[in-house]
From Swiss-Prot:
Residues 490-700 form the Ras-GAP domain. Transmembrane segments: none annotated. The gene is raskol. GO terms for molecular function: GTPase activator activity. Disulfide bonds: none annotated. GO terms for biological process: negative regulation of Ras protein signal transduction. This is Ras GTPase-activating protein raskol. Disruption phenotype: RNAi-mediated knockdown in both the border cells (BCs) and follicle cells (FCs), results in the abnormal distribution of F-actin protrusions which extend from the BC cluster. However, the number of actin protrusions is not significantly affected. RNAi-mediated knockdown in the embryonic polar cells (PCs) results in BC dissociation in 63 percent of egg chambers. PROSITE patterns: C2, RAS_GTPASE_ACTIV_1, RAS_GTPASE_ACTIV_2. Residues 1427-1438 have a biased composition (Gly residues). It is found in: Cytoplasm; Cell membrane; Apical cell membrane. It is a peripheral membrane protein. Residues 1363-1372 have a biased composition (Basic and acidic residues). Residues 282-400 form the C2 domain.
Length: 1580
């Protein structure tokens, strides 16, 4: 036996349930026009089975009970009136008699309507071309089906008409597939029986097609009414994405409270409900059945509000109306107005829950002469409004030109219209429209859990704190959202009571109760509209419509009734008295059906006032709530409260105004007097009805003794709480910024909760797409504009790692212009909404097709095939190499920092479905200032990206970066890493490996293509040794590169070597050799650059122990052999090399992360030295405007420790400190922290180019010092020229191993002097050198016999000459003049500007923190030097070593660092905003110095943050002062207005008194005159 259902007596709808009730249903033709005056509505008993996802309409309630016994779910009845099926046919029969000898469609004559007929009901899928017979189920006509047998009148149809067709399904059984195709329409009931014998006319093929193809013919006779296909019809709601439910505006169907079920095989049906609450519950139940988990997913809610006001410059004496279309779909229609002196509609349209649209179209029509039967309406023109123009916070009001499709006539008029296309522009017809499109990004409801809890517990404190600082519009929005949210939570009464009590205590004056615009009044208005709309219509519809339809005149002001007699004035006064009495009687009688929710709320008001001892204010408060804020405004403007559909006439408006004025005076318990003395004839009515008014207020504010059971229509569960919480998040985030900091702390932890939600939106909570839910990228800004991002759901791309697959769904956002980086789209520049930026929609959208911001999407389809091929290759290559890390978890959300300067920049995740990217304010993935979090994209899929050129002047500065914490967490979770990608686009062609931050003219093609499997092999973290390896891409030397880009473009011509390598390496745009591409003959055999700081220690020890220098050539040869052997060994072991991890900033303030490394370069960017002598594979310095030039001078060198020893020491250091690696340095503080955490195991690094403001990094500080120390040991002379001027935005740098970075891009390399800000500080270092000086860049002059690149020899003669002169000037500060056995000078020079010197150190402890030698005391080192050293200070080697005064050097360094410390303290704010221009110094760090430096770095960062916070507080205080001043002025104005009103009233009273006195005086005068004549006759 089946299970029984039970009728739910509760006031809630639980899922799943059986929802049922009577509805008026209409199913219209797709081409139905206005020739049909009445729509075929009919009552049907509708049943929604939420568990089965079916929506069935029955002709009777009894038939619907056939399947009740088989279910065990609650039943909920929504209709208010139990009605029979046959009693309420409110229209003509739905099936009109068809004359067999005519071809007329509905209406009888004329056939199909002309092109000027306006479609009454259009579908949202009109492009499908639906055709159907009015007696058949709606089908989609397929032009490919031309079989005439499908359209023939079959014998089964004849049997149906005779009633002899078999009844196939049993009543009550579930019908799924058969119902969609075989059910007949329910609108065929009670149709006239058609005589089959009359069907004698032959029907053409075209007419048969029009009648419909497929499906069964419906019943044509009364005998077959009992068959199941004639008494029920079912809609399957399980078609996800194909079936939708939406409310329908009353102007479309001519009925209130309608909704539409669109999609599915049957097309569209319209349902009319008895009230708005009933309609909302049906829509909620249907949507819940379609998508039960919608509230737990990320979604977007779109709404549109429009006001169509007036038109001008249209031909007069015509009747006009407008139709509102959203993407060619009819959503509303205005009333018909006659053009006289003014053509004014003034109608408001609210379209909630609309899909994503592109264009708003307003079509203007006019009625033609009645004699013309065919064309009753003529198209005048249209107004097209792009959606992105009306997405601002406030509604946008504007005059729009009415444009016609006709070329010669802008009005589309006939010859008698009186206009032509040559009309002046001033006479162009225009339409005044105000509209606002709002898109709300809604996160899953669980994300708002803390926010909802806070609001429920602290709404009173929030309202009290925000009240003084927010405007009227914000009060209205916040109040409405809070009311809806609290009503859904069952706290509306308590919420309103608390906020109203606050308002009463603040105002104090009883006469001003609810007179202002406060949160309390706006919240009360929202609650009244929410719960009392049906009550308002039931109460006031009859008297208002009667007053509007009647032509009686109620004007009683003598000044406005000039020429009227006293009799007519009395008649008008009597008419007004009757209208007022009728309206008041309806209101008084309405207490019988007064809403229970409002009654409870008003009862709570009375109880709270009694507790406060203000019982005297109860009646005033309740009357102000119900009359001042609800009933009287509804009488005054009935169209705003949906009582009428259009504005009443001028006379009716005046009548309604007088009625509302009288009722409001009655509710205030006052009398007419003063300036409204013409209304004094109603004072007797006011006195008589005052008692009844008090009785009415008492009744509606008293809880009944026997409360009625809760009605299902009062259930508030249908309210979308996620939408209201999203709106409140946006509004409160904006409002809190207006508060002073002290007041903000009063609302703690509200700011923290709001920030968490903002981060959740930026991280990208799951978004519902066909492929699943995806993490969405977003910009650093939240949705005050809402919004919002432009997404296009696409297919998911897959990637197989080892034996598992993970899907990465994607989104597509609005592509940015190629000439700029847009950090945040303005609210007015929102663009097209999410989900509609597809090439197909853009081709149809004339407003966006030529927009440069969407060119990338128009090319998206052409690029998808190429991306799929590349990703397949990546997948195959990846399986060959294999993953070292096997994922065991789903991908987490992107971990983003809270700071705007540390949010991930444009992150691209490309898969076969399209391109995903986001807008960001910063240029690279970065961490917050404290380095606690970072933003690393992670994924298993190889991503191929589209190249795009960005203008260098639009590049924002790069933030400080720290990634070790996230890398460490992700490594523990076995998540591989994706490469950092700022606002750079990575090319999809494997051969092009260059930075894409600036325009380039070079040839992107390479001699040899790098395998596509290396597209993402840019950086890895070694699990065994804790080494974060950074893969550096090579440079392209083949193409001429003469652009202004300061970043090198390099290329590889190698083939794969087959070695397995790490698949996740951070690519920073510098040559790479750590993996599977090895070219033995290109390896540098003579590179002796150290791999880490331990190599420097070896050099120091070696310099102390050996007093005799070896010959230069011999040493260089031996060292080259050692380094050659030491390099080949680690090259075969993937993941064990320490590359240049510290100079990670690329040009233009961006970090370019390439997925195509060029392994032709050596594994260290500072180790190659003889590349210039080896062939044509040298990578030129493609610098247009270099400020850094490293001059190579070949010569003698000293040997460093072998690479094997270096690798062992390096691995030990990495095992000890690997868990705290911070591989990317973005600033001085972050770089120091990275250096300390890494345990000193850093490599030599390069000075990377930059074209933004200066920001020196301690990462390069150390790494360049390593290069300099090694370079001091050999005969290679490096010159680090830095010439920076204030505001300079171009500087370049190169690797210390400048031999393989040879040629400059054909530009002048002369250093620019800095004028008065120039400062030259020269620190000399000998061979081995003092550790205090080793870290500085070396500057040497060219020596004879040493190899140098010809470009550098040509470009730098002046610099070399200046260098030699400065060497002579600063000899006394040089540590050792003799550098090596060669005949080269090793005097070191460092030239700095004061602007850049401030970033070298935070305090004097920097020297102690990084120089072990200086910490150990004033120990002097005996330095050996050649007798041939140029410009030596002493006559012999021993004399030169003894003459070195290290104490003076320490003092000089101390003074310099103190100066730099003061400079840093003075310019901290500028330091924070500076970009990533790097110039590094390095000294070996000791343990004590490291601790001191860490503490100093933290204190410095705290001071910077404190100063920034102080500045922000000052700005907020200024804003608060301005706001308070403005509020004060507003209050003064309001008070003055009240005083003026009081004075006006006093003047009126005085005038009345004077008038009375005058009348009395005149009366006395007349009496005296009557008595005076007898007395004056006596003297005569």
């Amino acid at each position: 036996m089946g299970r029984r259902t039970y009728l739910s007596r509760s006031s809630t709808i639980s899922y799943p349930s059986r929802i049922e009730g009577w509805l008026d249903v209409c199913e219209t033709e797709g081409e139905l026009t206005r020739l049909i005056k009445t729509l075929p509505w009919g009552p049907l008993y509708c049943v929604l089975q939420q568990d089965d996802q079916t929506f069935t309409a029955y002709c009777s309630e009894e038939i619907s009970l056939g399947d009740v016994c088989y279910e065990d779910i609650p039943r909920v009845r929504l209709d208010r009136v139990r009605r029979p099926a046959k009693a309420l046919w409110d229209g003509p029969p739905t099936l009109v008699e068809e004359n067999e000898d005519s071809d007329s469609c509905v209406g009888g004559s004329g056939g199909m309507s002309g092109i000027n007929d306006i479609v009454l009901n259009t579908t949202l899928y009109s492009e499908l071309g639906e055709y159907k017979s009015k007696t058949l189920p709606r089908i989609h006509f397929d032009t490919a089906l031309n079989d005439t047998s499908l359209n023939e009148d079959t014998s089964y149809e004849k049997a149906c008409r005779r009633g002899s067709a078999p009844t196939t399904p049993i009543l009550g059984s579930k019908q799924h597939q058969t119902e969609h195709n075989a059910t007949s329409r329910f609108t065929n009931f009670f149709s006239k029986k058609s005589n089959p014998l009359k069907r004698t006319k032959s029907v053409t093929k075209l007419e048969r097609t029009k009648r419909g193809s497929g499906g069964l013919r419906g019943s044509r006779s009364h005998e077959s009414l009992l068959s199941s296909h004639a008494v029920m019809s079912t809609i399957d709601l399980s078609c996800t994405g194909a079936v939708g439910v939406a409310p329908v505006h009353q102007s479309v169907l001519g009925r209130r409270h309608c909704f539409q079920v669109r999609g599915g095989p049957r097309g569209e049906r319209y349902y009319s409900c008895g009230s708005r609450q009933e309609r909302d519950l049906w829509i909620y139940s249907l949507r819940k059945s379609i998508a039960p988990n919608a509230e737990h997913t990320r979604r977007t809610d779109n709404s549109l509000k429009m006001w169509v006001y007036e038109a001008k410059n249209l031909p007069p004496k015509k009747r006009y109306f407008c139709e509102l279309q959203l993407d060619k779909t009819l959503y509303g229609r205005t009333s018909v107005k006659l053009q006289t002196d003014l053509l004014f509609w003034g109608e408001h349209f609210d379209f909630p829950d609309i899909p994503e649209i592109n264009v708003i179209t307003v079509n203007v029509f006019r009625e033609v002469d009645k004699k013309k039967k065919r064309d009753k309406y003529q198209f005048v023109g249209s107004v097209k409004i792009p959606v992105h123009d009306v997405t601002s916070r406030l509604p946008c009001e504007q005059w729009y030109p009415i444009l016609s499709d006709k070329a010669g006539d802008s009005l589309g008029r006939t010859s008698g219209g009186g206009g032509s296309g040559s009309k002046d522009k001033e006479q162009l017809p225009t339409l005044r429209i105000k509209c606002r499109f709002q898109s709300t990004d809604i996160l899953p409801i669980n994300v708002y859990g803390n926010f909802l809890t806070y609001l429920k517990e602290n709404y009173k404190r929030v309202c009290e704190t925000l009240e003084p600082v927010i405007g009227v519009k914000a009060k209205e929005d916040i109040g409405q959202a809070l009311v809806l949210l609290m009503h859904a939570q069952g706290l509306a009464g308590a919420f309103l009571t608390d906020v109203v009590a606050l308002d009463l205590l603040r105002v104090g004056d009883q006469r001003l109760t609810f007179r202002g615009n406060s949160l309390a009044t706006k919240s009360m208005e929202a609650f009244l509209k929410l719960t009392g709309e049906q009550y308002l219509q039931d109460t006031l519809s009859a008297p208002i419509n009667e007053l509007i339809q009647s032509e009686r005149d109620c004007e009683v002001d003598p000044t406005k009734t000039s020429g009227s007699s006293a009799g007519s004035l009395q008649r008008q006064q009597a008419a007004l008295r009757g209208a007022v009495r009728g309206a008041w009687q309806c209101i008084f009688e309405s207490h019988k059906h007064f809403p229970a929710q409002l009654r409870n709320c008003f009862a709570t008001f009375r109880e709270r006032l009694q507790q406060l001892g203000r019982q005297d204010m109860a009646d005033n408060l309740i009357s102000a709530s119900i009359f001042l804020r609800f009933l009287c405004p509804a009488i005054l403007s009935p169209s705003l409260f949906n009582i009428t559909s259009e504005l009443p006439s001028a006379r009716a408006t005046r009548n309604l105004t007088l009625v509302a004025k009288t009722l409001q005076t009655l509710a205030n318990f006052t009398r007419f007097q003063g300036k409204e003395n013409f209304m004094e004839f109603l004072n007797d009515f006011l006195e008589q009805e005052a008692a009844r008014m008090q009785q009415f207020l008492e009744i509606i504010s008293t809880r009944p003794e026997h409360p009625a059971p809760d009605s299902i229509l009062d259930w508030a569960g249908y309210i979308d709480q996620g939408k209201q919480l999203s709106i409140l998040h946006s509004l409160l985030s904006e409002s809190l910024a207006k508060l002073p900091e002290a007041r903000q702390h009063e609302l703690d932890p509200l700011q923290h909760i709001l920030d968490e939600i903002s981060r959740a939106k930026e991280h990208g909570m799951g978004t519902a797409l066909p492929g699943g839910y995806l993490p969405a990228t977003s910009s650093t800004h939240s949705i005050a504009s809402e919004n919002q991002e432009n997404r296009n759901p696409g297919s998911s791309g897959s990637h197989a790692g080892s034996n598992s697959e993970q899907l990465l769904p994607q989104q597509s956002q609005l592509a940015q212009p190629q000439h700029a980086i847009v950090s945040k789209p303005l609210s007015a520049e929102r663009g097209i909404m999410r989900g509609v930026l597809t090439p197909n929609s853009l081709e149809k959208n004339i407003f966006r097709y030529n927009d440069p911001t969407v060119n990338g999407l128009l090319q998206q389809q052409q690029q998808q095939q190429q991306q799929q091929q590349q990703q397949q290759q990546q997948h195959q290559q990846l399986q060959q190499h294999g993953h070292q890390q096997q994922p065991h978890h789903q991908h987490p959300l992107q971990m983003l920092s809270n700071s705007q300067t540390s949010i991930a920049g444009n992150q691209y995740m490309s898969s076969p479905g399209g391109l995903q990217h986001a807008q960001s304010q910063t240029s690279m993935a970065s961490s917050s200032l404290n380095g606690s979090s970072s933003n690393l994209l992670h994924g298993h899929q190889q991503h191929a990206h589209h190249p795009q050129q960005l203008h260098p002047h639009h590049c924002p500065p790069a933030p400080q970066t720290s990634a070790s914490s996230t890398m460490e967490r992700m490594d523990r979770m076995n998540y591989p890493y994706m490469s950092h990608n700022g606002n750079d686009y990575e090319t999809s062609t494997p051969s092009s490996t260059r930075s894409r931050t600036l325009p380039r003219n070079g040839n992107p093609n390479a001699n040899g293509n790098v395998g596509s499997s290396n597209n993402n092999q840019s950086g890895s973290y070694d699990d065994m040794h804790g080494e974060f390896q950074i893969q550096i891409s090579g440079f392209d030397t083949s193409s001429a590169f003469v652009c202004k880009s300061p970043t090198p473009m390099m290329k590889s011509s190698l083939g794969p070597a087959g070695a397995g390598r790490s698949h996740h390496k951070l690519n920073l745009g510098i040559p790479d050799h750590s993996g599977g591409y090895v070219r033995g003959n290109n390896l540098n055999p003579n590179s002796n650059m150290p791999k880490n700081l331990e190599d420097l220690d070896d050099l120091f020890k070696y310099a102390e122990e050996h007093d005799v220098a070896e010959p230069a050539n011999h040493h260089n040869h031996n060292q080259g052999q050692q380094n050659h052997q030491g390099h080949l060994k680690p090259a075969a072991v993937p993941g064990k090399e320490q590359l240049s991890a510290k100079s990670s900033h690329c040009s233009s303030g961006y970090q370019s992360i390439s997925t195509n490394p060029s392994p032709s370069q050596s594994s260290s960017p500072v180790e190659s030295q003889l590349k210039a002598a080896m062939g044509s594979h040298n990578a030129p310095l493609a610098f247009k405007n270099p400020s850094y030039q490293l001059q190579p001078q070949t010569g003698s060198s000293r040997s460093s420790a072998q690479s094997n020893t270096h690798q062992q020491q390096q691995q030990q250091q990495q095992q000890q400190f690997g868990s705290r690696l911070k591989p990317i340095g973005g600033g001085l503080v972050a770089a120091r922290a990275a250096f300390l955490n890494s345990g000193g195991a850093l490599e030599a690094a390069t000075l990377t180019p930059s074209s933004s403001d200066e920001q020196l990094s301690a990462d390069n500080y150390f790494s360049y010092a390593a290069a300099a120390a090694a370079g001091a040991g050999i005969a290679t002379k490096l010159e680090a020229q830095r010439s920076l001027s204030g505001g300079s935005s171009s500087s370049t740098s190169a690797s210390a191993s400048t031999s393989n970075l040879g040629k400059s891009g054909g530009s002048s390399a002369y250093g620019r002097l800095n004028g008065p800000l120039k400062r030259e500080d020269v620190y000399g270092s000998g061979y081995g050198g003092s550790s205090g000086n080793v870290g500085y860049g070396l500057s040497t002059s060219s020596a004879a016999g040493h190899h140098q690149h010809p470009h550098q020899q040509q470009q730098n003669p002046m610099q070399q000459q200046q260098q030699r002169e400065r060497d002579q000037e600063h000899k006394q500060y040089a540590g050792s003049v003799a550098g090596s056995v060669g005949s080269a000078t090793s005097a070191a020079q460092r030239r700095l500007s004061l602007d850049s010197a401030r970033t070298l150190s935070d305090s004097s402890t920097d020297t102690e923190g990084h120089c072990n030698q200086l910490q150990e005391g004033k120990r002097r080192r005996q330095l050996r030097s050649s007798g041939g050293s140029g410009g030596g200070g002493a006559g012999s080697e021993q004399g030169l070593g003894k003459s070195y005064d290290q104490n003076g050097e320490i003092q000089l360094l101390q003074q310099t660092l103190d100066t730099l410390c003061h400079t840093l303290d003075r310019d901290e704010a500028e330091l924070r905003d500076s970009s990533d221009e790097l110039f590094g110094l390095q000294r070996p760090a000791g343990s004590n110095g490291s601790n001191n430096l860490s503490l100093q770095s933290e204190s410095t960062m705290r001071s910077i943050i404190d100063r920034l916070i102080t500045m922000e507080e000052e700005l907020r205080r200024e804003q608060l002062k301005m706001s308070l001043a403005l509020s004060h002025k507003q209050r003064v104005i309001e008070e003055q207005g009240q005083q003026i009103a009081a004075l006006d009233a006093a003047n009126s009273r005085l005038l009345s008194a004077l008038t009375a006195l005058r009348q009395r005086y005149e009366t006395q005068q007349q009496q005296q005159q009557h008595q005076a004549p007898p007395k004056t006759q006596k003297p005569q």
